Amino acid sequence: MKFWSRPLTFLIIIIYLIIQQVNSSPPSLSIPEHFLRCLDTQPSDHGSPNSRTAVIPTNSSFSTNLMNGVRNLRFASVSTRKPEVIVAAVTETHIRATISCCKLLNLELRIRSGGHDYEGFSYTSPVPFVILDMYNFNKIDINMKDETVWIQSGASLGQLYYNIASKSKVHAFPAGVCPKVGAGGHFSGGGFGNLMRKYGLSIDHIIDAQIMDANGKVYRNRQAMGEDVFWAIRGGGGGSYGVILAWKIKLVRVPEKVTVFKLERTVREGAVDLVHKWQQVAPVIDRDLFIRLEIKPINRKISKGKTIKVSFIGMFLGLPERLLNITKQSFPELHLTKEDCMVKKWIESSVFWANYPEKAPIELLLKRVSTNEYYWKRTSDFVQAPISKQGLAKIFQTMIDHSPLPRRVWMQWNPWGGKMAEIASDATAFVHRGGNVFMIEHFMNWYRPGDELEEKFLAIARSFKEAMAPFVSKNPREAFFNYRDVDIGITTPGYNATYEGAKVYGDSYFKGNYLRLVKIKARFDRTNFFRSQQGIPVLA
């Protein structure tokens, strides 16, 4: 009896302890909770938990944090997959910890600098994912002695412009006209705006950068990352290679005063002839002048039916007197007058181009969060030969046929030429240089939710773009990477994106630069950690 008592007693104690352990164990953790725990196992700044920068769906602030960076209500529906975690990084340590935990828990990473990705790739995914929000990573350091700026990826264009103007009346930076756009995505896709004919793209004035790779290693300059990677992230989409931490940019000179204008003409007022002439003039006129077209269907004022209104929106680096001499010589049909011209400081012209009310304060450029009021689809095209008057008339009628007012398809036409034609197509990853007359951005907006309504308007947008095929580039039909379009093609979720599988959109966005981008990707991010439905794949 004594022989069996000790082992039996010992066995009973072990079973009891196991039962107690099971009964006292916490319930299984969710993916977000696992991620928070993982963050706090990573090295931190001054002992402060990394998880303090993160929110998960059970936090009351989660929805606000998510929606502050959602620019398109199409991707805010109940059916849209939400992130497991949003990490609002403040330091590089937070970014490194986020990358590490995504790898450990097999979660995709989405990097959001401003949230303006046209297909929502910076804040949506078909598989479980985490958003790395760069909103707080927004320092801007200006050195007027050498006319350079270090700008972190989460800073907005409006913040950049405002800070430049606070230091100088005669400096600017060539980038977009939407002040809420984040520098991270805008610059890495190319970055174009109303100074492009004079100075080219944003990437043509980026002289250095800092990037963190999939192992958390930071490359502090272009020499450290290598000139091939520095080439790739200027126009090839930085998010396919790593987390862009900051850019070093070179400022450009502008006059103390510039001139802006906006003229509107309908078909009855000669819009077809004017647009036809614009195609001949806008890409070759004095490069100090940029004239954008906005083409929209409207209701006729006198008789029933619809017509087309064309707005000629101009930016001139100089005063009205010289501008009028140029237009009288090169574009007299526009009938631009001194009364049409508005003289402004460059920073004030940024307010005008952002469509803020006349005399709105420049402080509006610092506003970063916008009210999400509508649903939309955007696409792009490049035109490489002027469209005939007959072609323009057909396009205008097709726009009317595709516009169930008050909803409508409409377009912006942005002239190329000038500096853009002087830069080689392989100088940066942005390939669309010489040989293009102008770029088209297609718009379709609607204001009510619903899957059926969305399919209706997406079908209209696709049908109209298909109707534009005879007038735009071919083999491939080129597209602007920053104006993402899933209709061009996507890769399946996961690690298996291949060179051939991604070629359908790779050729449209990058043409002859695509293969080089893939080879650089294979060296710098060989596991394809930084991936999305339209990312650069590894060579396979």
Swiss-Prot record:
Organism: Arabidopsis thaliana (Mouse-ear cress)
GO cellular component, one term: extracellular region
Any one biological process term the GO annotation gives: response to wounding
Mod. after translation: The FAD cofactor is bound via a bicovalent 6-S-cysteinyl, 8alpha-N1-histidyl FAD linkage.
UniProt keywords, alphabetically: Cell wall, Disulfide bond, FAD, Flavoprotein, Glycoprotein, Nucleotide-binding, Oxidoreductase, Secreted, Signal
Short name of any one Pfam family annotated for the protein: BBE
Keyword Secreted: yes
Official protein name in the record: Berberine bridge enzyme-like 16
Top-level taxonomy: Eukaryota, Viridiplantae, Streptophyta, Embryophyta, Tracheophyta
Cross-link entry 6-(S-cysteinyl)-8alpha-(pros-histidyl)-FAD (His-Cys), positions: H116-C178
